[in-house]
Amino acid sequence: MATGWEPDGISENEIADGEAYHRALYINGDIGSPANWHRESAERLVQLAIPHIKDGSLVVDYGSGTGGSAIELLKEVEKRGIEINLVLIDPLVSWFSKARDLLKGRPNVHFELSIEKDDSGKLSFRRLEDMLGGRKADVIISSSTMHLIPERAIRDLASQFSGSLKEDGVFIWDSGDLESEFRPDHSALLHDPYRAVREILRNDEIRASRLSEMSSEEVLQHEGRLDRIFPGPYSMDVILDALGAVGFSSETHHEVVGFSNDDAERFALVPRLSEIAAPLLPGEERDEAIRAALKIALADIAEQGKGSHLEYRSHWVYGVHRLG
């Protein structure tokens, strides 16, 4: 049985949020049927990690979400008859509780919630070395997480990775939402459609009416929070430079992954992500507004030559980093 963190007092809304994101990764929630974009992007990450994994390896999945990358990794190691110790780490209770539910029956799987609350109620991120209890990992993977880390925090996180790996350890990550000099002109970034939806709905009449009932300070805080759901992209060089500064070598890869319009809609309607349309009311009002805006956004991406009437092409980058 899995060990470590367990959800306590999770709400129905949080359960629904985790289930919706899981279904954005797996068709109808079936872990045997990953959505094309998840299958292709995770497959490359797993194949880069496998050569560094052997029986008994301690593998850390940093930013596990609902467990999508961990599930794909476990499929591959089991196929090869390899037994690993896997630590999943994430700060979001709603998504992480779904990962716990999916993997709770597996041995050698451990969960660590990466946020904690002090006596005053203030939340902060726990350090990786503390979550591992002094153990050193053979491999750290991180899927679709690095682009969500603020630039100012990357250097410290790189140091945590360095301090939490064995001398011959490796850090492997992927992202579909970082700028790079080798992104093909015919591809978009992973979150481009959803940032476009945010902009289209920014001046929606119903939204504007609801915002007008707030104070200017409330509007500023509200809109700032929404802008952070799909933050603007920065260069992958920020990450490579930070990792290099703490002693990592760097090897990079990239590929273009198709993201179907149907998958994009499922993704955009995940409750936590659909907050980009707030204060439109959750449910039909919000969902219909997002669907309409997403249709416009995807058509515009196709018009730019970065997709078709069926999908957009997302550009993914991968990093493999060794110490020494």
Language-model regions: role of each:
Residues 1-54, 68-72, 76, 172-210:
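Conserved class I S-adenosyl-L-methionine
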Residues 155-167:
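A short glycine-rich, Lys/Arg-flanked "PGG" loop and its adjoining helix->strand segment in the class I
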Residues 123-140:
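A short acidic, Gly/Pro-enriched loop at the edge of an enzyme's catalytic core
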Residues 24, 28-29, 251-305:
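C-terminal helical/coil "lid" or tail adjacent to the Rossmann-like core of SAM-dependent
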Residues 199-278:
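Substrate-binding/catalytic lobe of Class I Rossmann-like enzymes that use SAM or dcSAM, i.e.
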Residues 60, 66-127:
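Class I SAM-dependent methyltransferase SAM/SAH-binding core
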